[in-house]
Amino acid sequence: MEIQYHKHFSHALGRDMECKVYGHAGRPVLFIPCQDGHYNDFEGFHMTDTWAPWIESGQVMVFSIDTIDSETWSNKGADPQWRARRHEQWIDYITCELVPFIRDTVNFRNGWSGYPGIMAFGCSLGATHAANLYFRRPDLFDSVLALSGIYTAEYGWDGYMDGIVYQNSPVHYLANMPADHPFIHQYNQHKGVICVGQGAWEQTGTTFRLREICQEKGINLWVDIWGYDVNHDWPWWHKQVPYFLPYLLG
């Protein structure tokens, strides 16, 4: 498996950001680590083994990045308005700086002149971020695999709400999205999977709410609820990835 390490200065964040790229060709996948995670977690938690059939066959290239959750979602003692602005700077880093890098990389590696959408993938809080990117920017992300996420920003902000927190809280902005909003047509041209178990440490409430909202709005989304033995942990996420990938890549 080809692995590359990159470090770029982010103007949005005012600091260096690191990432690893796994694979030599194929569709781009953006992996967002779990809460407070780092770019090497895809490898450190052995997702390289789980994704290997698709990476080594040239079907996907996985871009694994850093979070800044320790400054934002986890930084409960800091000013919530500052934390929200800082999180939005991370979103700007992804959409304005990282996405062009991903686009250039996959086009060069595949000999493409066009640009396919990116799959957003994450587990736990990484799933929260992945789903938010998918729903906020359907022009950039055409698929999502979100495992064991929470789809409200209330988790990180404990009831504080402003415009920035709102636009990072899918159950809030999707519930208020007009039925004729152009994003809905885009969602329905894409493929999305939201999965959660019902075992230890899982929180299902916002997944059920997200499913309800998407049904009301006519948004196509595969929401899959697994059993009471399915825990919020890596062994189950390793089982879920190969179950859903054939659908998402088909």
Regions found by a protein language model. Name each.
Residues 1-250:
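Non-catalytic cap/lid and distal C-terminal segments of serine-dependent acyl enzymes
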